[in-house]
From Swiss-Prot:
Binding site for GTP: D19, H20, G21, K22, S23, T24, N136, K137, I138, D139
One Pfam family cited in the UniProt record for this chain: EFG_C
Catalytic activity, reaction form: GTP + H2O = GDP + phosphate + H(+)
Keywords: Cell inner membrane, Cell membrane, GTP-binding, Hydrolase, Membrane, Nucleotide-binding, Protein biosynthesis
Protein name as catalogued: Elongation factor 4
NCBIfam families linked to this entry: lepA (TIGR01393), small_GTP (TIGR00231)
Membrane-related topology note: Peripheral membrane protein
Source organism of this protein record: Xylella fastidiosa (strain Temecula1 / ATCC 700964)
GO terms of biological process kind: positive regulation of translation
Gene name per UniProt: lepA
Length: 602
């Protein structure tokens, strides 16, 4: 190594849309640098969880330290920091990028640029990173490198004349990627302070070590035995061990400035080491933390209830364990009259919710009922207090409410020109307001402000279907905005079912109420008595449908004769039904709770 220890370090991450070959390229880079032997190089090395593999999402083991001997004869220390690709995890992406000096922008040469990579690339450029375009999948017959280069220049606006064309699958030209990293990505720069500053890129829970934090040391050094201060929580922890991933975990004597590695300090849960926070020495702290830290706020909420009430303690334990690994997951106990005991959970987005639900069902063998996801609303009461409401059933009485505000997001949609009309129609249906339409080569960027409540249910699926799968979407939260919202309750035989309450725009309330009643009528099984299904706003009923009773033919044994005999039997049956209706309870199947989701899918 040269006299300046940071001169030969290169910290970089890979930005790519889902399925553009990010994990495969990472595998090839690890293989070329000899991180793993050939027999160990089976599948995507960096995706360790089975759900990650299936869905192609990256959560853990997010950094690899490699040694590379370049063509100029020098040894370089490469730190690859992997980033999640999905919009739900955009905060994690921004933290991963903050730890780097450069990024590889991987674009599938057969498909061109997609919205996710555009958003992440803008984040990288804003943070001053050197972006190196890589065109992947050039072995495919449909690959068109010139078109992909032109798209990078028009859509993202960075120079792609020196883009490296590779095939990660076959390993063709991957060596050139390593040379580009060494030559074009700058080395880490020393900071203006001598005191220790380290950025937490990610944290996860290990059963033996407690919390393992992946950190980028900006200035100073970390050695075992140091007492570290977590700047946002104000707590101190003693360092047990430090090291790097190669991608196996390897222990080192210390981590110095410019390096990326892991730190364990017997922290008991991931909330003790939040992503994006700054570590410094307790004895000699840095004057201020690194910029950009924010608490991760859940955006989508849903109720999770065990089908069997006896599973409630198991569900609590499973959620506690998941939370050790997932700082964005929030939950609190909830009691529903219809479903019994369960939890109200907060997620980053729909994908995050699906992953959590899938992990609970797979890893912990739980059978769950999920209520319709809702977003968080702000309610301004008449006395001037502002409350955040994540559960429609907890909405204050109408006479106490001054205004209700819903979350608005800014969405950027990239679509081929043929489908612009369909995309605009879809956004207008979802109460969107158009910001801009920009024609970029053979892609169109449509920017809309949309209510988040309309996006969380089925917007993504509908967008894919109206554009035959070609459009891609990226969004971020903007603000809360006031609007005429009401809560539509569902009453079954006069009893309110809290899990079926939804908050809707007043103009859509009647239609939603009518559709909900019709849908429930098909799903609730017939009973021995009439079941009345009503949709109501406050005390005003806006729609009703009835599940007719099953009835026995009590007149079957009567032959001709006097009508009064028949009347007596019918009256007796009617009395019995009336009594049953008073004491009878209607079992509501799981499909009925999901009906709330499917109303818009007609």
């Amino acid at each position: 190594m040269s006299s300046d220890p940071m001169r030969n370090i290169r910290n970089f991450s890979i930005i790519a849309h889902v399925d553009h070959g990010k994990s495969t390229l990472a595998d090839r880079i690890i293989q070329l640098c000899g991180g793993l032997e050939a027999r160990e190089m089976e599948a995507q090395v960096l995706d360790s969880n089975p759900i990650e593999r299936e869905r192609g999402i990256t959560i853990k083991a997010q950094s690899v330290s490699l040694l590379y001997k370049a063509q100029d004869g020098q040894n370089y220390h490469l730190n690859l920091i992997d980033t999640p690709g999905h919009v739900d995890f955009s905060y994690e992406v921004s933290r991963s990028l903050a730890a780097c000096e450069g990024a590889l922008l991987v674009v599938d040469a057969s498909q061109g640029v997609e919205a996710q990579s555009v958003a992440n690339c803008y984040t990288a450029v804003e943070q001053g990173l050197e972006v190196v375009p890589i065109l992947n999948k050039i072995d495919l017959p449909t690959a068109d490198t010139e078109r992909a280069k032109a798209e990078i220049e028009t859509v993202i606006g960075i120079d792609a004349s020196e883009a490296v064309a590779v095939s990660a699958k076959t390993g063709l030209y991957v060596e050139q990627v390593l040379e580009a990293i060494v030559q074009r990505i700058p080395a880490p720069q020393p900071r203006d302070t001598e005191k220790l500053q380290a950025l937490i890129i990610d944290s996860w829970f290990d059963n033996y070590l407690g919390v393992v934090s992946l950190v980028r040391v900006m200035q100073g050094e970390i050695t075992p035995g140091n007492k570290l201060l977590v700047m946002s929580t104000g707590r101190s922890h003693q360092v047990d061990a430090v090291g790097v991933f190669t991608p196996k975990r390897k222990t080192l004597a210390k981590l110095t400035a410019g390096e990326v590695g892991w730190v364990t300090a017997s922290i008991k849960d991931v909330h003790g080491a939040p992503v994006g926070d700054t570590l410094t020495l307790t004895s000699d702290p840095a004057p201020k933390p690194l910029p950009g830290f924010q608490e991760v706020q859940p955006r989508v909420f849903a109720g999770l209830f065990p089908v069997d009430a006896e599973d409630y303690p198991d569900l609590r334990e499973a959620l506690e364990k998941l939370r050790l690994n997932d700082a964005a997951l929030r939950f609190e106990p909830e009691n529903s009259e219809a479903m019994g005991f369960g939890f109200r959970c907060g997620f980053l987005g729909m994908l995050h919710m699906e992953i959590v639900q899938e992990r609970l069902e797979r890893e912990y063998d739980l059978n769950l009922i999920t209520t319709a996801p809702t977003v968080i609303y702000e309610v301004l009461k008449n006395d001037g207090t502002l409350v955040a409401m994540d559960n429609p059933a907890k909405m204050p009485p109408i006479n106490q409410i001054n205004e209700i505000r819903e979350p608005i997001i800014r969405s950027n949609i990239l679509t081929p020109p043929d489908y612009v009309g369909a995309v605009i129609t879809l956004c207008e249906e979802k109460r969107g307001s158009q910001i801009s339409i920009t024609y970029l080569g053979n892609q169109v960027q449509v920017a809309y402000e949309l209510p988040m409540a309309e996006v969380v249910l089925d917007f993504f699926d509908k967008l894919k279907s109206v554009t035959r799968g070609y459009a891609s979407l990226d969004y971020h939260f903007l603000r809360f905005q006031e609007g005429p919202f009401v809560r539509v309750d569902t009453l079954i035989n006069g009893d309110r079912v809290d899990a079926l309450s939804v908050i809707v725009h007043r103009h859509q309330a009647e239609r939603r109420g009518r559709e909900l009643c019709e849908k429930m009528k098909d799903l609730i099984p017939r009973q021995m008595f009439d079941v009345a299904i009503q949709a109501a706003i406050g005390s005003q009923i806006i729609s009703r449908s009835t599940v007719k009773a099953m009835r026995k033919n009590v007149l079957a044994k009567c032959y001709g004769g006097d009508i009064s005999r028949k009347k007596k039997l019918l009256e007796k049956q009617k009395e019995g039904k009336k009594r049953m209706k008073q004491i009878g309870r209607v079992e509501i199947p799981q499909e009925a709770f999901l009906a709330v989701l499917q109303i818009d899918n007609k």
